[in-house]
């Protein structure tokens, strides 16, 4: 009902329907194939979730500015990495190839964040942000720090677990909340 009311008030939102149909179709296909916890299903769910940022911007403004796409991209990269990392701790905990993939993925996140931070510091990407250049630059460097922390934990926590550390799914989730908070703060600036 809420979706119908929203579309009635802002019919231009229907432009998003095909995108969400594809993304959610992938997730549903994985459920039908009895693989609701697959990496593909998780990524499809992340994409659907982070696309809500530009959808919300579109709803409010009637258009989408660069910061909404920046948020969606960085949140998508971060949360996909979280799925990969959690798999190394639970379903793929003894899979060294998956652990290597996770560490490599998180290293790429650091690199992408670093490129944006350097470009922000040089004033190249200031057009993305409605905020002042200083806050935009600070936020991008905080994102580099959050990405580096996520890279470190993608290596250190599985290593700790392998060496006998007690890492229950609950503990993994609770510690991940701190990293997620760091990413959110960095993006909010």
Question: Could you describe each region identified by the protein language model?
Answer:
Residues 8, 12, 33-40, 63-66, ...:
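Membrane-interfacial loop-to-transmembrane-helix junctions in polytopic alpha-helical membrane proteins
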């Amino acid at each position: 009902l809420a979706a119908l009311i929203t579309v009635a008030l802002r019919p231009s939102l229907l432009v998003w329907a095909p995108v969400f149909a594809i993304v959610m179709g992938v997730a549903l296909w994985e459920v039908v194939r009895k693989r609701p916890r697959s990496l593909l299903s998780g990524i499809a769910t992340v994409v659907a979730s982070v696309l809500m940022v530009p959808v919300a911007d579109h709803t409010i403004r009637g258009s989408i500015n660069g910061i909404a796409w920046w948020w969606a991209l960085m949140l998508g990269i971060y949360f996909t990495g979280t799925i990969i990392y959690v798999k190394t701790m639970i379903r793929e905990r003894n899979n060294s190839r998956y652990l290597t993939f996770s560490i490599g993925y998180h290293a790429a996140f650091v690199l992408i964040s670093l490129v944006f931070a350097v470009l922000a510091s040089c004033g190249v990407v200031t057009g993305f942000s409605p905020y002042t250049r200083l806050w935009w630059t600070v936020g991008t460097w905080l994102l580099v720090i959050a990405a580096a922390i996520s890279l470190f934990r993608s290596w250190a926590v599985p290593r700790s677990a392998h060496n006998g550390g007690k890492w229950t799914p609950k503990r993994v989730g609770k510690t991940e909340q701190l990293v997620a908070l760091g990413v959110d703060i960095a993006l909010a600036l």
